[in-house]
């Protein structure tokens, strides 16, 4: 089994897990819709992806979602796989963290993927097929210090996906919860600190983490196998 000939829409596709996933799916023959905020970086990824549409937009801009869905659907003839990957992490103690940081992380990591899924869902239901993948985190299963906002959002998106699966599974749709552990990306470098500024330095555990290409290979294999929960972490291999 593979994603050959299928249309996959990935948010946060300009780097890290999103970019690696795009390249891996393209290698299987999938057609890609690549979304994010950095158009130049998306175009660089698209060069490796064969048939690809670069569709930049801000996922928290609710007004931009409906036009993006329309464009993606019309270009592809129907989305077979939506990967809600765009996100932002946190590195700060709760006692020090501004409320605005909670608002920002919940907006990006929870409300934005819900909004995009809700906009696309009626089309998938009407067609009677499709996959929706939520990139949560190990921090969406276990409370991790210095990440209270991030944990809240990632637990939340996992709960949304679990409930959604119960609603649409009998309609031909599959919903996957993906829980990456330490994958070697810029996630910790781009994390927000207590005042909302970018951290700018990486965690050693992240730097020494699973290479993105290996992580996404597992994700793809387990999605094709129909796994509901996909844990991508050292020692979690099946």
Predicted regions and their residues:
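Substrate-binding pocket helix/loop in short-chain dehydrogenase/reductase
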Residues: 93-94, 98-103
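Conserved glycine-rich cofactor-binding loop
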Residues: 7, 14-15
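Active-site helix of classical SDR
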Residues: 117, 153
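Conserved glycine-rich Rossmann-like NAD(P)H-binding loop of the short-chain dehydrogenase/reductase
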Residues: 28-44
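The beta1-alpha1 cofactor-binding region of Rossmann-like NAD(H)/NADP(H)-dependent oxidoreductases
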Residues: 57-67, 99
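Residue(s) in the substrate-gating loop at a strand-loop-helix junction
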Residues: 137
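SDR active-site lid
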Residues: 166-233
């Amino acid at each position: 089994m593979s994603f050959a000939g299928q249309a996959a829409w990935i948010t946060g596709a300009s780097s890290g897990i999103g970019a690696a996933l795009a390249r891996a799916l393209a290698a299987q023959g999938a057609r890609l819709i690549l979304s994010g905020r950095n158009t130049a970086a998306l175009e660089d990824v698209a060069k490796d992806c064969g048939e690809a549409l670069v569709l930049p937009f801000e996922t928290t801009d609710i007004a931009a979602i409906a036009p993006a869905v329309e464009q993606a659907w019309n270009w592809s003839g129907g989305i077979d796989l939506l990967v809600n990957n765009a996100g932002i992490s946190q590195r700060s103690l709760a006692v020090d963290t501004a409320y605005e940081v909670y608002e920002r992380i919940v907006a990006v990591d929870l409300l934005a993927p819900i909004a995009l899924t809700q906009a696309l869902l009626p089309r998938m239901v009407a067609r009677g097929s499709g996959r929706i993948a939520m990139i949560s985190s190990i921090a969406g299963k276990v409370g991790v210090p210095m990440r209270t906002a991030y944990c809240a959002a990632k637990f939340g998106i996992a709960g949304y996906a679990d409930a959604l699966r119960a609603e649409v599974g009998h309609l031909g749709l599959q919903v996957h919860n993906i829980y990456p552990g330490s994958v070697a990306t810029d996630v910790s470098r781009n994390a927000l600190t207590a005042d909302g500024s970018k951290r700018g330095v990486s965690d050693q555990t992240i730097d020494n983490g699973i290479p993105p290409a290996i992580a996404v290979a597992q994700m793809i294999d387990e999605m094709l196998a129909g796994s509901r929960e996909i844990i991508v972490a050292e020692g979690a291999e099946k």
